[in-house]
Amino acid sequence: MKFADVAVDAPAGHGRTFSYSIPDHLDIVQGQSVKVPFGPRTLQGIVFAVVDAPQVEETRDIADTLSAGALLESHQLSLARWISEYYLSSLFESAALMLPPGGRFRPRTFYSLSPNVDDVAEAANSPHQQRFLEYIQRHEVVDAGRLDRALGPNSRSMAARLVERGLLESKVRSSSRQMTHKLVEHIALNPEMLEEIGVWMKNAPRRSARQATLVDALLEADAPLPATETRKEFGAHNVARLRERQWLTFTQQRTDRDPLAGQMFAPESAVGLTSQQQSVTDAVCAGLDHPDEAPRTFLVQGVTGSGKTEIYLAAVERCLELGRRAIVMVPEIALTQQTIERFASRFPNRVAVLHSGLSAGERFDQWWKTREGDYDIVVGSRSAIFAPMLNLGLVVVDEEHEWTYKQQDSNPRYHARDVANKLAELTGAKVLLGSASPDVSSYHRSLAKQYGLLILPDRLSVSKNGKPTPAPLADVDIVDMRQELKEGNRDMFSRQLDAEMEACLDAGNQMILFLNRRGTASQLQCRSCGHQMRCAKCDIALTYHRRAGRLICHYCGTRHRIPERCPQCLGYRLSYYGIGTQSVAEALEQRFPDTTVLRWDRDATRNIADYRELIEKFRTGEGQALVGTQMIAKGLHFPSVTLVGVVLADVGLSIPDYRAGERAFQLLCQVAGRAGRGERPGRVVIQTYQPDNYAIQASAAQDYQSFYNKEMAYRRERGNPPFNKLIRLLHTHINQATCEHEARAVARTMADERDARGIGSIEILGPVPAYPARLRGRYRWHIVLRGPEPRALLDHVALPRDWHVDIDPVSLT
């Protein structure tokens, strides 16, 4: 008998599998999805190995298969093991990242009364059992979750006992939608009737002209025609008449749900590269030609507009010439469209798209067509790193510094850039990171020769002959808003920004105004007692949205009516203060009434269709001004934009996070890079109340090296990454006192364990309330472990439930 080591969809230690015996009637292979019994439940598992001997003496049989064969390749299973071990997540959760859309089996148990039960009162052993059976009898079929809500937390054990007695029947079904290939009916001529059809066509009566036209269309077609379109074009009656004569055959054929269907991509050939671009490209291509040689990873640090995308295109082209395939990742779904256009134009019919903005059917078809080898390139956001690519040769991570590459809301809390490096190690691929403002840890690795550092120091513009030529960076001015106030200007626009906006619009150019805050005003506050309107579930200020007429929490989405009186002192002196994108857009429309202002934030653009529409409007000149948050700072190319105004650069600098300065620098660098990307020079105005801040000064000068040196000095002094590693432990609870007590108890246990083992190099910071201290109705306390190898402490301390472990957190808020 053979056995299988199976990762099961149940809470388990990281890296753990369970042994199951393989029944004779099942063919089980490594990488297959299966159903297995686990305690009283039936759960999904993924087979990690088929072995001759089990880990334990007694095993249970695999119940059934969930996939016809292997869904995961051996390198994907190895990657899952690494993710599980490194990020301290279950092995199943790690492997499930790579399953096809719809590949998760989320079991729900349904109970119904056994047909053998005639009299519930007679069958029950107690009044409680009778009420239980009567409830199921009334509702006929009830799932376990509904039983818990209606009859209490012990209902499942009661149901299990009644199933054993034969009074209830139970069935397990998946609660997730089962995805399949889309089948569409097609029509073709019956080959056995062609002779009869030919005779009829020679003598077809005039009244049957439409039928004859239909026959001609089917004869000329290279493949069967879709039935729905055929009936529309030639008439359902005519199709039916030919079917009655048995002249037609009807088949169900697989039809792909293609997210790029209907989009036109003009063919694009490779452009000439500058000498700097060619030098960088040659280095990357040499690495692709010699996959076993170091470095495994290249970091391209190029100023905004330096032509990094052309490097990516050239590298992917070389990868394909070598018979290998590529993954291209971007940090935001909003950026995928622009990237898709470039790659689909250069490599027609070879590009797949994978991100959460697609429909479930589109994701399913793109995943399977990629696995079947129909596509050589996958473009997508963070999750694209798990695309089922065989023979992988290259992974491109554009804007590699972006925090959105880190999964923060659920396990495993992986970083796609680090996963890319491990995947490349397992497959022999190369990784190409690109950024104008690299993550300081990435730049540190490149200086330590762990990455190959490639630099593009010059911005480029395309001349009239189509060749790229060096172009100046936009001129940047810092405006001290404290001085504006002293001189009597209380407007949100400084006098300099106002003058620059007027000149920009008068010249027929476009402009971007950036503010890292949504809504109309940040806060509603009582001027009598100082009380600030805050979310009842989350410990953060509510944001006022004028058009909705509501105060909205940007964390949990709760909407609140605007109070007439202060809930604290019952006074009437409520005042709005602060600015958001909506109020900036409205102020701009008031200042320049003939200007069309577009707004881009998560309130105005909810899905990928909204993104595409807005980008197209701005690209074609329908809007002269674009107001937005972080999304407009990331890699977008609008040649007509000559002015960028940063309305308030200070937002985010005061957040209690060691990376606040780095994030501010990166955002300001990126948004400044949107100006002057065409033939006309660009200008940037940064408004701030902290004009001497090192991050603001360095971003204005587009001086990454200066910022890096100061930031690294601060981090070395405080022992923060890359000089040490961090692990964040977050505990949540509905009761504040319980949350604090549990956090302090765990911190004491860790301190005792650290001291007992003599690993004093690990600091235990906290516990302290997280920021925000309350979120979605749950209080939050966290502990941060800092040291050369802080996870050594976690190997000896078992965390209770309701704790979340974040390895290498990108934020401590």
Where in the sequence are the language-model features?
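Generic structural signal for residues in well-ordered beta-strands
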Residues: L168, L248, V351, V476-I478, ...
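Accessory, non-ATPase domains that flank or precede helicase/AAA+ motor cores in DNA-metabolism machines
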Residues: M1-S435, S442, L447-A471, P772-R778, ...
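Generic solvent-exposed, charged/amphipathic alpha-helical segments
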Residues: R81-S84, D148, A585, E589, ...
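C-terminal accessory/connector segments of nucleic-acid motor ATPases
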Residues: S89, P100-F110, P115, A124, ...
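Hydrophobic, Leu/Ile/Phe/Ala-enriched alpha-helical segments that form helix-helix packing faces
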Residues: L151, L218, L588, V671-A675, ...
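Inter-lobe coupling/hinge segments of SF2-like helicase ATPases
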Residues: E268-Q278, D282, E293-E740, H782-V784, ...
